[in-house]
Each structure stands twice: as C-alpha cells, then as structure tokens.
Amino acid sequence: HQTLLKAQQYHELIGLDLKVIEDPQDAEFKEGRINIIDIPLENPDELKFGEVQAQCGNAAYQCIKKMVELSVEGKISSLATAPLNKEALHAAGHIYPGHTELLAELTNTEDYSMLLYSPNLKVIHVSTHISLRTFLDTLNKNRVERVINIANDFLRMAGYEKPNIAVAGVNPHAGENGLFGTEEIEILYPVIKKCQADGIKVDGPIAPDTVFLRAFNGEFDLVVAMYHDQ
C-alpha cells in the first residue's frame, strides 16, 4: 500500500486513523477514521508535495475512475472530490477541461452540464471550462435548449412538481433590447419561447446582475447561467 504509506507520513499531524479497505462494504465509519481504497502510485518516492507532476494527475484520474466504477456498480451513492489540477491531469495525458467532462465520458453521458447546488441557490451552466471569447463564438439555440431541459428534468427528479427556471442574459442588462448585444434577441428569446410552448415554466433572459439574487430570495428554483464565472 505505497499510497497509504505516503499518506501516513502526515496523518499524525491531523490526528486521523487511516484504514485500507478493498470494498466500500468493508468500511468502518467512526470519528477520526478515514477508510481508503488504495490506488497504487507508480513511483511514490518521487512525489514532491506542492509541485505539479504528471503522476499526481494520473493518480487523480485513477481515483475518479475508481469512484465512478463503484458508483455504477451501486456500491456508493455519491462522489465527493477535491479540486482537480488541470495542469497535472493534462501532463499525464488525460485531456479534460475538468470534472464535468471527465465524469460525462466515464459514464457515457452525452447530454450534461455542470450544476452548482445549495438549498437557496441552484445554478446550471450553458458553457463551462472555455474562454469567454470561445463561449460567445459557440453559443447556439440547441445548447441553450438542451440545458434548460436538463435543468427542468433535474428539478423534477429532485422533487419539484412545477419547476420555475430563470435564464440569465449574456450581456449587461440582458442586452437592453439590442443596445449592448444581440445574443438575447437572436438566441435566448426564441429558445425560451419554444421551451414555454413545450410546457416548461421558464422566464428570461433576465439581467445577470439581478437574477441570482432573485433566485436566492426564492423567486426562481434554478438559474441557467451562460458561462462559467457568471
């Protein structure tokens, strides 16, 4: 258990008991205990903490892959991941923009989006790990419609009988009728009208500087954001 031995060098500093298990059913849940399924490292002695390394990126990939396998097998019910260093991941040859795309490929999922969830605010993204310029160049009706439908399906699965969805605008003031950009007029309005005709309760596009507060205050169940840092 080379990976565990490396971790044990530090466990006394934080007062945790590390237990190696082969299967989730072998886990013992008690205070101070961390159950570990060991993922072997190729050269653990070469690890340099605080530095970006290819084998660290590969280790992260293998851990996520193992979690997905356990989830698909029904042995675990959810995943909790630490931040993924994209530079290390790419150095190991795993070319993914982030967790979202990696999880989609490992689960053979074609329609997907990143969703941020909290009791008071839920946000789903039309685009994720791409530049703002690329987002503007690739924004299209089909993608926006797919994300609205994903959002509606998710809320229904989460127990919302009549989901109420808001769509954020792309531009300041949601374009101000074309004064500050035409994406709202050319792309968002037509898609929203189509989704409404399909029976989805969706409103927008709404100015990005107010829509999140309105959702937080309970006016909407979820916001469809246009890009990663909106």
Place the predicted regions along the sequence by residue.
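Short, structured patches in soluble enzyme cores that scaffold and shape functional sites
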Residues: 119, 125-130, 169-171
